[in-house]
C-alpha cells in the first residue's frame, strides 16, 4: 500500500483498494519508519512515493537497487512503485469500486506492455533471490517476509492488470502462507500482519457458498481477525504502517464503520497533505455517513486545493464529480450541473472522468428541461470516446431526454 503497498497486500484484488497510499507531500521524512535497506535515498524515495510522485520515487529506488543489487527489499520497493504507478495510470485505484460487495476493481485503460514486462522481470528477479536464500535456511524470516511481499504484488498484478484470477489467488495464498510462517517464527514481526490481515478479511467477506468451496482447499478467513491484524500493523510504526491504515480505511468503509474510518483520514491528511485521494476519501466517508454539508465542504476544499496547485497535475477533478453526485442525490440539479461542469475547467482532465461529468451534466440539464444544453453535453461525451459505455448512454440520451 505503499497503497499500495495496499498494493503490497496482494490479497486478490482487495489490495488494489485505493492507493490512497502514496501519501505524503508535506510529510516529514523523519516521521517515516525505517525502510530497508537503510539509507537516506531510500527514505526520500518513499516520501516521493507516498506523495504520489511515482516517477521521482522510481528514480530513487533504481539508485538504491543499483547500490544493493542483491537486496530483496530494494527489489520489492522498486517493484511496488512501478506497479502502483501503472495501476494509477490505468485507473484501477478508484476507492469507490472497493466500497461495495465486490473486491474486483476495473482497469479503465490498457496497461503499458513495456511496464508489464518490467514488472514480471522484477518479480522473477526477486523470487529467484528469495528462493535461493530460503534454500539455505527455510526459516529466514526476512526472506520469507520478502517473498511474501513479492508474491502479494504479483497477485495484484495478475489480478488487476492481467485479469488472471486463479493466478492471482494462487500468489495471494502463497503470500499469506509466507507471512503466516513469519508470524509463527517471529510473532513480533508486525509488518507481516498486513498481508495476513488483508487476506483474512477478504476471505471472511466471501459469500457462504464460496467460503465452503475455498475451505475444501484449506483456505479460510475471519473479518474481525483481519481488521485486528491491520490495526496491529498500523500501530507498529513499521514499513507497512501507513499501508495498513489505508487498507483498514477501505475495509471500515465497507463495514459502514464511518467514524473509525474518518479517524484514519483525519490522522493521515495533515501528514500527507498532497495526497488528494486521502482528502477525497474523507468527503466520500462524510457523505456515506449522512453528513452531506460537511462532505460538500470537503469536496469543495479538495477542488480549491487543486486549483491552487497543491496537487500538481494529479486528477483532483474527481472532487467535482463527487460534489456533483452529492448535490444530485439531493435533487439540486442546477448546482449539480454546475459542479459537473467544473471538470472541464481542468487543463488536462482525465478523459473518462470528463466523459462521466459531461454525461451527468447532460442528465441534469434534461431534468431542468434545458434540452439544448443537454444535447451539447451528450455530444461532448461521444466526441471524447465514441466506443465505450459512456458514449452508448449519451447516444441513448440524445434519442430520448433523461428523466429521473
Name each region found by the language model.
Residues 29-41, 48-60, 70, 81-139, ...:
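Short coil/linker segments at helix-helix boundaries
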Residues 39, 73, 142, 149, ...:
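Start-of-helix register in tetratricopeptide repeats
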Residues 43, 77, 84, 146, ...:
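"A position-specific structural signal for the A-helix of alpha-solenoid helical repeats
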Residues 67-71, 136-137, 185-186, 237-239, ...:
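Short solvent-exposed coil/turn linkers within tandem alpha-helical repeat scaffolds
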Residues 235, 239, 367, 371-404:
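Terminal, low-structured helical/coil segments at or just beyond the last alpha-helical repeat
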Residues 241-254, 284-293, 300-354:
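Alpha-helical adaptor scaffolds
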Amino acid at each position: 500500500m505503499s497503497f499500495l503497498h495496499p498494493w503490497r497486500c496482494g490479497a486478490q484484488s482487495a489490495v488494489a483498494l485505493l492507493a490512497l497510499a502514496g501519501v505524503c507531500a508535506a510529510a516529514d521524512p523523519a516521521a517515516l519508519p525505517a525502510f530497508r535497506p537503510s539509507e537516506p535515498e531510500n527514505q526520500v524515495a518513499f516520501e516521493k512515493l507516498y506523495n504520489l510522485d511515482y516517477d521521482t520515487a522510481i528514480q530513487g529506488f533504481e539508485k538504491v537497487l543499483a547500490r544493493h543489487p542483491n537486496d530483496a527489499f530494494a527489489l520489492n520497493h522498486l517493484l511496488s512503485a512501478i506497479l502502483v504507478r501503472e495501476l494509477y495510470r490505468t485507473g484501477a485505484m478508484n476507492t469507490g469500486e472497493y466500497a461495495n460487495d465486490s473486491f474486483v476493481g476495473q482497469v479503465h485503460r490498457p496497461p503499458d506492455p513495456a511496464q508489464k514486462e518490467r514488472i514480471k522481470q522484477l518479480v522473477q528477479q526477486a523470487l529467484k533471490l528469495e528462493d535461493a536464500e530460503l534454500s539455505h535456511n527455510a526459516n529466514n524470516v526476512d526472506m520469507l517476509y520478502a517473498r511474501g511481499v513479492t508474491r502479494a504484488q504479483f497477485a495484484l498484478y495478475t489480478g488487476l492488470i492481467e485479469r488472471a484470477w486463479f493466478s492471482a489467488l494462487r500468489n495471494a495464498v502463497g503470500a499469506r502462507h509466507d507471512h503466516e510462517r513469519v508470524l509463527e517464527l517471529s510473532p513480533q514481526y508486525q509488518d507481516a500482519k498486513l498481508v495476513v490481515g488483508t487476506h483474512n478479511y477478504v476471505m471472511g467477506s466471501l459469500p457462504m457458498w464460496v467460503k465452503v468451496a475455498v475451505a475444501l482447499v484449506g483456505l479460510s478467513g475471519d473479518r474481525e481477525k483481519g481488521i485486528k491484524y491491520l490495526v496491529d500493523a498500523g500501530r507498529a510504526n513499521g514499513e507497512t504502517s501507513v499501508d495498513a491504515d489505508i487498507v483498514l480505511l477501505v475495509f471500515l468503509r465497507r463495514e459502514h464503520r464511518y467514524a473509525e474510518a474518518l479517524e484514519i483520514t483525519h490522522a493521515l491528511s495533515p501528514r500527507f497533505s498532497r495526497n488528494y485521494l486521502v482528502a477525497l476519501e474523507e468527503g466520500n466517508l462524510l457523505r456515506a455517513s449522512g453528513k452531506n454539508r460537511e462532505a460538500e465542504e470537503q469536496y469543495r476544499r479538495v477542488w480549491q486545493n487543486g486549483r491552487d496547485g497543491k496537487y500538481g497535475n494529479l486528477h483532483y477533478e474527481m472532487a467535482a464529480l463527487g460534489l456533483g453526485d452529492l448535490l444530485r442525490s439531493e435533487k439540486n440539479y442546477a448546482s449539480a450541473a454546475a459542479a459537473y461542469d467544473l471538470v472541464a475547467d481542468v487543463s488536462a482532465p482525465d478523459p473518462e472522468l470528463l466523459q462521466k461529468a459531461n454525461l451527468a451534466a447532460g442528465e441534469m440539464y434534461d431534468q431542468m428541461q434545458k434540452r439544448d444544453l443537454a444535447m451539447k453535453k451528450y455530444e461532448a461525451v461521444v466526441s471524447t470516446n465514441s466506443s465505450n459505455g459512456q458514449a452508448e448512454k449519451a447516444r441513448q440520451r440524445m434519442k430520448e431526454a433523461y428523466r429521473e
